Each structure stands twice: as C-alpha cells, then as structure tokens.
Amino acid sequence: MIKLENIHKRFGETEVLKGIDLDIKQGEIIVIIGSSGTGKSTLLRTVNFLEQADEGRITIDDISVDTQKHTKAEVLALRRRTGFVFQNYALFAHMNARQNIAEGLVTVRGWKKADALKRAQQILDDIGLGDKGDSYPAALSGGQQQRVGIGRAMALQPELLLFDEPTSALDPEWVGEVLSLMKKLANQHQTMLVVTHEMQFAKEVANRVIFMAEGNIVEQGSPQDIFDNPQDPRLKKFLNQVGIE
C-alpha cells in the first residue's frame, strides 16, 4: 500500500500542492492529467523526495516518512522502493545502454558489477533492445533512450514506478514504442503513477484517472467516469481543450 497524506508544497509565495491525499493499491495504474502548472509533476517528485514537500507524510509499505522530520536513511529507504522515469531520459552520456541500466544495481542495491551487467542485458532483451547494449545514448533514438530509462527504473524492481511525462520530449514516431512498453509493465501488474498528456493511454491502461487543477485533486475515477461522465466544470473544459468531448 502506498499512501500520500496532506502533501503541501510551496515555491516562494506560490502554493503548488494544497494538501494532497492519495492511496495507491498494489498493482494499480494511476494516471494524473491536467493543464500545465497544476502541480502534477511536483506531486510526482515529492513521492521520492526529488522535491521535498513542506508538509505531509509518505508511506510505501513498511516505510513511512514525515516530510518535515526525517532522517537521510528514511529517505533513502523510501527511494529504494521507487523508480523514476524522467521526461528527458536523464541517461549518463558516458555510459552505454547496458551500463546505464546496471548502474543503479551497483550503487543502490550493492550488486557486483558483473552480475549487474548480466541483469542489465536481460532487461535490454526484455524491452526489445537486446542488440543495443554497447550503444551510447547519443547513438540511440529518443524512443530507445526512454526505453533504456524505463529499463533502468525496472532494474531496481521498485514497489512504485513514477513516470513524469515520459513521452513529451519524444518525436511523434517514437511515442508508440514507449507507450507499448508501459502497457507491457501494466499487464505485469507493476504499480505505476503516471503524469502524461497521452489521453488514449489513460483511457486504455489506467485503473484510475486523477484530474488536478490549482494544486488540488479535483476529480478522480475510472477512465469511463472521467472521460465519459466528467462532473467538475474545470475537467469538462480541460477535456474539451484536448479534443475529448
């Protein structure tokens, strides 16, 4: 069980998150939608302390961390239960694909390098990049780089995978391969919290869709509830703006 309680975050005088509460069940795929600047990515980044919330509590299984009073060890334990997929891939340019995936196993999990590289190759095979292990990021397409980024997060076998707009930096021709991999993970019952503008993905894959506006969760429900029977005027306006009527 994953639980966010009363999460607040301010940047200067601007309150970006206004007391978010969210429970996530094991194996659940939750997609967060909403206009830019509504706090979606900030919420995602507070889950594993890439951004430290000003107030609130985050619980993943047996680890519960107060965002105001905590130790480095508690934060590290929380992070070890999550994997983060960045919008801009965030691969190490001086490492090949295999090394990028293996790095976390060595530095976070304490694996021997040879074992980590072997596991990394297995993951590359699994994500359809088995022949790209020796390739450096500059030699990979955007879609391939993002799949390596997902593979790196998968390698740690996290309780929760966090996706921050994983397709928004991609050329259109590479979006499909990344979404296909995410669907594969969903079918394997990987718990996922996804911020995306890919409405079709939300419709097809999410167990629950959350609409955020002005730092709050305004409406949430099944894809059918959100897309076919929206209640809040702000959600109706947003769906109209993105071409869903």
Where do the model's predicted regions map?
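Helix-to-loop junction immediately C-terminal to a conserved catalytic motif
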Residues: 48
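Short coil-to-helix segment of the ABC ATPase nucleotide-binding domain corresponding to the Q-loop/switch region
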Residues: 95-103
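Conserved ABC ATPase signature
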Residues: 136-140, 144
